[in-house]
Amino acid sequence: MIRPGKVLVLNFLKRSLSNLATFKGSEINTKKYDLKLPNNSDSNKQYFTLDEKLKVIQYTDANEESIIDEFILPLSSGAKASDTYQKTNLSKMRNLLTTFHIDEGESLPLSKPGYIKETPFEYHSKYNSDTSYVSIPRLSVTKLLTFQWCELREFYTIFSGSPVKKETKEMKLGTEAHLKLELETHNLIDVEDIERITDEFVEKKIDSSKRHINTLADPDDILLAKDDLSKLTELLHGAIPESSMANEWMSKIISRLFTLINTSEAREVLVHGYLDFQTSHFTSNLHDFQLNQSNLVLVSGVVDYLKLFNPHDKTDYSMFEDIQDHVEFTYSSQRKHQWIDLSQFLKDIDPIIKEYSDTYKIAITDVKTRSWNKLPQQESVLQAAKLQVEYYRNMFGILAGEFDDIEIGYEMLLENAKRRNLDVDKPISIKSALALLKANHTIILKDYVKLANGEAIGFESFDRFSQERYLNQGSEYDFTKVLEGTNREDYISQIKASDKDGFDFDEILTSDILKAWKIPLTLRYFAARSSQLFHLCKPFLSDSLSIEYHNVKKNDQCFHTNYYNYNANEIDEVTAKASAFWNGTRPPIPVQDLSKCNYCDFSSRCVIPNPHKNVPGSYGSVGSKMKHFI
């Protein structure tokens, strides 16, 4: 029984297939779609008329979409739709036809229909299969490279709802290759055991508080105790998104840039910037940034590789030797651990950086993975790779204060967190603080002690804020609420017994930390330290860029490197074009190399490879009605 309204779908399918006088019964998977083909006395009959086909479709909730998928795309080549398109591509095309109200026989438009009011960026931020782009409107660096394959394809992808790409085997191999390179430079510290054990202690503490509440009789006492329990739970293992971002900034900015300055290289470093579509420029000074924040678009990226070196003598490591000779480390009583005071380190290293700033430079490299020792053939792809690393250089320079001072990096990091709906002053959970301490104790233990004691860390904006907010009223950041007395000994004992790295917490979890802190650990602290480390790199900024091509099937070896010089004017020109595209002030530019159309999900309806197709002269109403059924 065809439900009311389904006739519309059938009529739509009928019109869509009207260009096919007849087609073979073998082209339809009758079992899959529950199609009951007419009986015919001629057992050899393989053709059925369109009317016959449409009469016998028995719609059920389970097969409606599948039938539409099979019919909605023109089978111009005579091939089965299931052989030509994957499910994702069918959905992508179906969504686009619906959005653009495309009728049978019409090709996709070359510009946005007038009834769609959203710009490409607004649509990307409103209708996106990756909901994180809806909750946190932003672009990646690669999204600015709209021309790298076909701008029209990017345009269609956006208005089809930006379907998430299914990870291919090649993509997986590329991810594994990047991780392998990362681990060659940065040790992976296992914190699973400490998180698990901390969770167990936290749950014991919470259960104890709950049992205490059950012993109370006075309603006011119960209400007060429940409020205390809520705060305790949040303190011990709450603030999950803030804690996650703290880990990202600690591991992918602070730790990485500290490693760069001390050892000459770092991998996988987070960068971001803010693009003004109106001016078509990335904001690079604090005044403009604070004045126009609401009009700026967040653009994020990850630098694959940073190398700090002497371009005239790549064997020269004298700066790093001087750093090791002049920087003071503190050792534990049994010399198992060494710690550095970041505040003092930044002071001590300043004259060394000034001495070597004319000699040493930072080169920025992006790593591309291939399945064979061959570069991409398309010039647009090679050019996009170059521009991608130029964007990284541009954003790294802005965060380092290339055009302003240290404050701009700090404010941009805070704004980044706020745009992700994070509270930069919400205390990081005790659980995360302990895991971060294990993974990064060399560079943050002394900072933990400073915060606990209410001391300045040497960054004026952060210190001034902390003085005004906490030192007169205090904070509720208290490690003793989970680790005190015998709990501490038991906690450390369990960690020692299970820790795979042989890590000794006994000399780290001292009374200097296990107390009520005067200044809590927050994202604001991590933004402050991140901006200081970015600023440390400012004197070494250079025009040296490169792209490395690695073969993932030959032990990830680098088989070719392209070297470039940073060109700010080129970036400005490309950014202007990208801004006009995303802001909707110009239509997309079609591809000229038609061989690319062979790899496009929209080629069957696109007028560029099919100039004989009708360009939509008007947009019918069928598409909008189809939304109710597909």
Swiss-Prot record:
Range of residues in the leader sequence: none
Cofactor binding, per record: Binds 1 [4Fe-4S] cluster.
Keywords, in A-Z order: 4Fe-4S, DNA-binding, Exonuclease, Hydrolase, Iron, Iron-sulfur, Magnesium, Metal-binding, Mitochondrion, Nuclease, Transit peptide
One of the record's GO molecular function terms: 4 iron, 4 sulfur cluster binding
Binding site for [4Fe-4S] cluster: 150, 597, 600, 606
Superkingdom of this protein's organism: Eukaryota
Main location: mitochondrion
PANTHER family the record matches: EXONUCLEASE V
Quaternary structure (record): Monomer.
Full protein name: Exonuclease V, mitochondrial
Organism: Debaryomyces hansenii (strain ATCC 36239 / CBS 767 / BCRC 21394 / JCM 1990 / NBRC 0083 / IGC 2968)
